[in-house]
């Protein structure tokens, strides 16, 4: 029997540790729909950036909430960037299909983009306005996800 362990909340890796008030770093990713998303676009208006892997149970629980936010706020001009921490496109596509998710995502083979933002913990969601991080959500018991994220977006 093989056991696959991917770290979620308790991992500790190298990388940045951005905080509320920091400006998002420069980066560019290609989304699964072929569109290109970069920090310049994310610095114009309200944006929501999520790092995830589909092997992480906490991420799998958070993704449907992100889909609800995406469906509600994309028409209002909020930009969404769902970026894998380090996961192949075929694995993500399979999960998206099985869960009925429609949000574009960027499959990243390595943790390069993730490490511009954080050294540990997924899921990790950054809500930003004009490139400034206004809130950071990780899936911890004291940090409810959907209602709190919605409240922050509504304030911006």
Task: Kindly give the residue locations of the regions a language model identified.
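Short pre-active-site segment immediately N-terminal to redox-active cysteine/selenocysteine motifs
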Residues: 45-47, 52-56, 121
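Thiol-based oxidoreductase modules, predominantly thioredoxin-like and allied folds used
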Residues: 76-90, 101-110
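Thiol-/selenol-based redox modules, centered on thioredoxin-like
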Residues: 127-156
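A short beta-strand-turn-helix
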Residues: 28-47
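Short, internal strand/loop/helix patches
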Residues: 93-130
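Hydrophobic beta-strand anchors of alpha/beta hydrolase catalytic cores
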Residues: 48-49, 80, 125
């Amino acid at each position: 029997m093989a056991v696959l362990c991917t770290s979620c909340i308790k991992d500790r890796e190298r990388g940045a540790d951005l905080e509320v008030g920091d400006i998002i770093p420069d980066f560019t990713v290609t989304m699964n729909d072929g569109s290109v998303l970069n920090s310049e676009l994310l610095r114009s208006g309200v944006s929501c950036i999520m790092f995830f892997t589909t092997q992480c149970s906490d991420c799998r629980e958070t993704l449907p909430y992100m889909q609800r936010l995406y469906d509600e706020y994309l028409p209002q001009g909020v930009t969404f960037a769902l970026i894998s921490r380090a996961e192949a496109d075929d694995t993500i596509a399979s999960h998206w299909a099985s869960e009925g998710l429609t949000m574009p995502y960027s499959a990243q083979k390595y943790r390069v983009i993730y490490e511009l933002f954080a050294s540990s913990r997924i899921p990790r969601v950054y809500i930003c306005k004009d490139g400034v991080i206004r809130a950071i959500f990780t899936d911890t018991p004291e940090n409810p996800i959907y209602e709190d994220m919605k409240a922050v977006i509504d304030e911006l």
